[in-house]
Structures are given as C-alpha cells and as structure tokens.
Amino acid sequence: MKIRPLVAEDLPQLQQIYAHHVLHGTGSWEWEPPSLAEMTDRAQAVQKKGLPYLVAEVAEQIAGYAYASPYRPRAGYRFTLEDSIYLHPEFSKQGIGLLLLQELMLQCGSLGYREMIAVIGDSANHASIRLHERAGFVEVGVFRNIGFKFGRFLDSVYMQAQLNAPASTPSN
C-alpha cells in the first residue's frame, strides 16, 4: 500500500467510493452521489488552496482517500482544518484509514495548521469515531438530531486534534 497525492486519473474511482458512502452510509449526508464533474470540481478546489488530497493505493486500486479543507471561511479560523476520509468497502478494517489520516495530519501540521476538526455524521458511526480516536482526536461535542437521512434523524459528532504545528502565536 502506498499513500500519494491525488491525480486526475484517480477521480473515477474516488467518485465510486464516495457514491457508495452516499447511497449506503451516514458518513455523508448527501442523498444523491455527485457526478464525476462535481467530484473533480471539489477536488480541484481543495488542491487550489494548497491543501493535501491523498489516496491510498493497493495493487493499482484506490483503497481510500482523505483530504483537508478549511473548517470555516472566516479569517479567524485560518489555522483550523476539517478532515474527510472515505474507504472502499473492500478495504475497511485493515488499518488503511488510520495511515491515511495520520499522513493527512502530518502534512497539514507541516503546512502550519494547528487544529483539525472531524465532523462525523451519525453518532452510531463507531468505526469513524474509533478511527479518529486512534489518530489522537478527542470528542468535543455532539449536535443532536441535526441531520436526516434514511428515514431517521442523525447526530453529528465533533472531534478535535492538535496538529504537529509550531506552538508560537501568529500575528494578525
């Protein structure tokens, strides 16, 4: 398995992985999978910001992907990112997610970001919560019943981790 930056040729496989999670899971609260063109636009938006967009590759197949995006658009949040991570169902529970998340955190820390937020759709998503705990995240709050998918209301779990970034306080 190798972790590397996303290239355009990866996007069809990423779109299929994400579509699976949209249609069968609560990790994303979208109801309809985005098109390949939309996935391409989203990935390019992350890359244009200079943020990592990583894929895990096993035998030339994409096993999963992870990327960081700004937590909020306002300037006061500029040192905080949100992670997103999705695995191909055939590659879950093999440690790939943890390796992807750890590499994402390392790269974001080296870029000077201080904090990473995980917004986990559904408090019953124990696998994602455990994954983030293993990577050093701690739960900081739960918003109850704020989402709706598959005929039920869903909680959103917020987790936070400090990144490997300098401890100095930046000037405005």
Tell what function each PLM region has.
Residues M1, Q61-Y65, L154:
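Glycine-rich phosphate/pyrophosphate-binding loop shared by adenosine-nucleotide-utilizing enzymes
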Residues K2-Q16:
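A short beta-loop-alpha structural element at the N-terminal edge
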Residues A8, P33-E90, L101-Q102, Q107, ...:
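Acetyl-CoA-dependent GNAT
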Residues Q15, A19-A43:
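Conserved GNAT-fold acetyl-CoA-binding loop/helix
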Residues Y67, V119-I120, E133, V138-D155:
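Conserved catalytic-core motifs of GNAT/GCN5-like acyltransferases
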Residues F79-L81, N145-N172:
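C-terminal "cap" of GNAT-fold acetyltransferases
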Residues K93-C108, H126, R130-R134:
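Conserved acetyl-CoA-binding loop-helix of GNAT-fold acetyltransferases
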Residues C108-I120:
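Conserved GNAT acetyl-CoA-binding A-motif
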